[in-house]
Amino acid sequence: MHWKFSNFRKYHLSFHLNLFDLSLFFISFYCFPILYICFFNQVHSFRSTQPSLIMNKFDLFDDYSTKGSTIPLPNENFDQLFLSSEANDMEFLFNETLMGLQDLDVPSGYGIPQNTINNDFQHTPNKSKSHSRQYSGTAIFGFADHNKDLSINGVNNDLCKQSNKAINTQSVSPGELLKRSRGSQTPTPTSALPDTAQDILDFNFEEKPILLLEEDELEEEKHKQQQRMMTQSSPLKRVTTPSQSPFVQQPQTMKQRKPHKKTNEYIVANENPNSYKFPPSPSPTAKRQQYPPSSPIPYNPKSDSVGGNSYSAKYLQSLNKTQQIEYVDDIEPLLQEDNNNMKYIPIPVQEPMSYQKQKPVTPPLQSQNDSQQLEPLKTPQPQPKQQQQQQQPNNEQDKEFTANFNFNTFLPPPTPPNLINGSPDWNSSPEPHSPSPGRLQPPQQISPIHQNLGAMGNNINFYTPMYYELPVQAEQPQPQPQPHQQQHQQQQHQPELQNTYQQIKHIQQQQQMLQHQFHNQNNQLRQQHPNQFQNQNQNQNQNQTKTPYSQQSQFSPTHSNFNLSPAKQLNSNVGSMHLSPLKKQLPNTPTKQPPVTIEWSPVISPNSKQPLHKQIKESSPRRRIKKTSLLPPGELDNYWTGPDEDKIYTCTYKNCGKKFTRRYNVRSHIQTHLSDRPFGCQFCPKRFVRQHDLNRHVKGHIEARYSKCPCGKEFARLDALRKHQDRNICVGGNKNVISKPTKKKGTNNTQQQLLKTDTVVERIEKQLLQEDKSVTEEFLMLQ
């Protein structure tokens, strides 16, 4: 009789496993002899019992020492158990047992596809049909949701379906198992469990099991954290070294993580070193073999085919111990060595200093004609130490510099110490740069004249100090370039230099022509305007004493005003003597420039029949004057005469004879005779001779609505209405106002007192006539 594990479901057999039982299950699963004994014991006990009986919970994993003597122990003889009538019975039983694992969802040994290793939250495509396999944060050893179903990710439940990879269906016979167990006398350590398990249990596993050690995981996390801190702190302190991984003994990483390649990095401590030491540079011959001479040699730390530097840190430190160099600020001794193999020389930023270096004179390498053709460039010029040092390199350094860097560039003049934003230095000026050679900035190609100089050659020394003057103390004798060095450079770059020199000569000729024209025009202007130039020369001498830069900047070709229009060229050339380059604003006294005057020039058509003076008179702009008369011009002058000896004007219209002291008054008077009233009111049909009469009339229209008395009388002005009401002579008068008598002009207080006494005397006389004489006598005596 043969049985399958599917009978467990038929008879409702369930395995309630705890943590201890589960660990025993996996140990027995990897140790095949113990597992086989368990299976055989269950088969034997299941045959002897009734089918309706239910197994106890822990019968499968009971202690085998308490069982009967019929069950052999691992150290006992198994031959009596394996003897059978048929040779293939045990193999068939073992295969049936393995087939029963399908119903229990026990892992059957299919490997995880490579594309799902790094996907921690995605199930494999081969899902089980019996239950859904999901991850659980609290599940222990594959038991999802703490249920009875074993759930392990990456296991294909359907054994009937064909797998993508080849499946090894070869089983293990018990005889081979005993031979292997007898051959291994020592017990298997924990580190060898994956190999023995693979040999013993060939359950179609394609990948080796994973052995996870907590110590290795902690070391790996520390290593990754240290790498992350170093990359964040300083990327310059990472030097490639050969691979020295501390995790070589670990067979694999976690199955759900893809094993990533570790970069070969040498980690330097984040501390201040005593001195910086660099690996020795390779020989020039090796560089020439690797790279063509025209291409620049890039710096690649990972130049080996392996992907890292072949030198270790200790080896490099041991090499540098023998070659210890003290880096000092003074690099003069380093420059005097002839056979120095330094690739980069730190040049301090300071004022130019004299540097004298003698070399043996070699015979000239070029003909005399070529040297005579390039004679203008042999004139000694004040050059900084950096540029002289680059003109006289060694042979090896010269080749390396031409391949790597372009040191011979167009240098700007040295910056004076007291420059401001408006100074002629090309770094400090906010204005666009001039096209002169001394102010050229080669990377930006600003100048329209020297746009092609960058493509002519890389080893061109072009330095023309046009906008500055060196102080007397800083001028030191510089050694003249020796002829053999210049000829050596000419031989290397002869065609490029000749084209460049020709362009430079052409530019210098253009500058001379511009200066010559500029001087000629200034001389002509001096002859035409001698007074203006005398004042300008005085101001110019004052400015030159204050600014040493103004002498060379006055005749710069960048400030010639030849592109101006003819109307503005005169005044601009007059003031051009005081222009400085790029609106220089050095401390000086500002001079008043002559004002620019704009004059009106009439346009006269040649086909006109009128004479010239009439055309000019008619075409000239006139001021718009408001007409003061409607009569034709000169009509009013026919009716008046004057002024006479007394400066009096007399009206002669129809023997009027009125006399006026002003011409305006006599003309207005004649306009009244002729009814010439040009100023009309816009509110009524009245018209007036003079403008101020119209203004007074219009004011009356505006105030008429407010200047009407209740008595019915209207007034043109408000002040007239108020006077009328203050008199209190009508219904609309102000009764609360007491009218005061007006004083007559020319009367004194004494006269007024006399008048009062006269009136008093008259009243008294009238009373005396009415009364008795006695009363009057008494009254007179009292007085």
Curated annotation (Swiss-Prot):
<keyword id="KW-0805">Transcription regulation</keyword>
<dbReference type="GO" id="GO:0045944">
    <property type="term" value="P:positive regulation of transcription by RNA polymerase II"/>
</dbReference>
<feature type="zinc finger region" description="C2H2-type 2">
    <location>
        <begin position="679"/>
        <end position="701"/>
    </location>
</feature>
<dbReference type="GO" id="GO:0031505">
    <property type="term" value="P:fungal-type cell wall organization"/>
</dbReference>
<feature type="compositionally biased region" description="Polar residues">
    <location>
        <begin position="420"/>
        <end position="431"/>
    </location>
</feature>
<dbReference type="GO" id="GO:0006357">
    <property type="term" value="P:regulation of transcription by RNA polymerase II"/>
</dbReference>
<dbReference type="GO" id="GO:0036171">
    <property type="term" value="P:filamentous growth of a population of unicellular organisms in response to chemical stimulus"/>
</dbReference>
<feature type="region of interest" description="Disordered">
    <location>
        <begin position="166"/>
        <end position="195"/>
    </location>
</feature>
<dbReference type="GO" id="GO:0032955">
    <property type="term" value="P:regulation of division septum assembly"/>
</dbReference>
<dbReference type="GO" id="GO:1900439">
    <property type="term" value="P:positive regulation of filamentous growth of a population of unicellular organisms in response to chemical stimulus"/>
</dbReference>
<dbReference type="GO" id="GO:0000981">
    <property type="term" value="F:DNA-binding transcription factor activity, RNA polymerase II-specific"/>
</dbReference>
<feature type="compositionally biased region" description="Low complexity">
    <location>
        <begin position="372"/>
        <end position="395"/>
    </location>
</feature>
<dbReference type="GO" id="GO:0030447">
    <property type="term" value="P:filamentous growth"/>
</dbReference>
<dbReference type="InterPro" id="IPR036236">
    <property type="entry name" value="Znf_C2H2_sf"/>
</dbReference>
<feature type="compositionally biased region" description="Low complexity">
    <location>
        <begin position="483"/>
        <end position="497"/>
    </location>
</feature>
<dbReference type="GO" id="GO:0010811">
    <property type="term" value="P:positive regulation of cell-substrate adhesion"/>
</dbReference>
<dbReference type="Pfam" id="PF00096">
    <property type="entry name" value="zf-C2H2"/>
</dbReference>
<dbReference type="GO" id="GO:0043709">
    <property type="term" value="P:cell adhesion involved in single-species biofilm formation"/>
</dbReference>
<feature type="zinc finger region" description="C2H2-type 1">
    <location>
        <begin position="649"/>
        <end position="673"/>
    </location>
</feature>
<dbReference type="InterPro" id="IPR013087">
    <property type="entry name" value="Znf_C2H2_type"/>
</dbReference>
<feature type="region of interest" description="Disordered">
    <location>
        <begin position="219"/>
        <end position="311"/>
    </location>
</feature>
<feature type="compositionally biased region" description="Low complexity">
    <location>
        <begin position="535"/>
        <end position="544"/>
    </location>
</feature>
<dbReference type="GO" id="GO:0000978">
    <property type="term" value="F:RNA polymerase II cis-regulatory region sequence-specific DNA binding"/>
</dbReference>
<feature type="compositionally biased region" description="Polar residues">
    <location>
        <begin position="302"/>
        <end position="311"/>
    </location>
</feature>
<keyword id="KW-0862">Zinc</keyword>
<feature type="region of interest" description="Disordered">
    <location>
        <begin position="535"/>
        <end position="624"/>
    </location>
</feature>
<dbReference type="GO" id="GO:0008270">
    <property type="term" value="F:zinc ion binding"/>
</dbReference>
<dbReference type="GO" id="GO:0005634">
    <property type="term" value="C:nucleus"/>
</dbReference>
<feature type="compositionally biased region" description="Polar residues">
    <location>
        <begin position="183"/>
        <end position="193"/>
    </location>
</feature>
<feature type="region of interest" description="Disordered">
    <location>
        <begin position="355"/>
        <end position="452"/>
    </location>
</feature>
<keyword id="KW-0804">Transcription</keyword>
<keyword id="KW-0863">Zinc-finger</keyword>
<feature type="compositionally biased region" description="Polar residues">
    <location>
        <begin position="355"/>
        <end position="371"/>
    </location>
</feature>
<feature type="region of interest" description="Disordered">
    <location>
        <begin position="474"/>
        <end position="497"/>
    </location>
</feature>
<keyword id="KW-0843">Virulence</keyword>
<keyword id="KW-0961">Cell wall biogenesis/degradation</keyword>
<dbReference type="GO" id="GO:0044182">
    <property type="term" value="P:filamentous growth of a population of unicellular organisms"/>
</dbReference>
<feature type="compositionally biased region" description="Polar residues">
    <location>
        <begin position="545"/>
        <end position="575"/>
    </location>
</feature>
<feature type="compositionally biased region" description="Polar residues">
    <location>
        <begin position="227"/>
        <end position="254"/>
    </location>
</feature>
<protein>
    <recommendedName>
        <fullName>Cell wall transcription factor ACE2</fullName>
    </recommendedName>
</protein>
<keyword id="KW-0677">Repeat</keyword>
<dbReference type="GO" id="GO:1900189">
    <property type="term" value="P:positive regulation of cell adhesion involved in single-species biofilm formation"/>
</dbReference>
